Amino acid sequence: DLRSEKSLAWVAEQNERTIRELFPSSSPIENEPLHAELLEVFDDKNRVPTVSVRGDFLYNFWQDEDHVKGIWRRTTWEEYKKKDPKWETVLDIDALAEREGKSWVYKGARFLCYGAGEYRRADGWVRSLSEGGTDACEVREFDAMEKKWVTENPFYIPNSKHTVCWVD
């Protein structure tokens, strides 16, 4: 049981052990220089977004103080080249979690490759979501062009540990 008292105590013990190894002083972790440096890097709003190019868009998963669970967003090449590109939200994980009453953690996406000559298609994706950040995920088919979950005969894998690939 992942949420049992015994399991949570084990996790807390391993976290403490790791913190002692990384930050050997007795001061709180927040006072450690490495902690501050890492936070500065991860929270920098000017960091260059890593993108996946599909069709006419560049896609990026982004987290910040306004999007704690994250948003999946897109922009065009022209916008991406600008100092402050405009992004369009495609999927908001925070809003999804609130709407569904689940503590969703985004675990990635797979673009559905349609085969030779179809490289510009960007509509089909499967998204992996984990409740509470566990190793198990559910996989749902998402239409990026419509910005919504596929409801008619969708690809779906219920919560489990698995690997997914697309074969047409």
Q: Which positions does each model-derived feature cover?
A:
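Beta-propeller folds
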Residues: 1-168
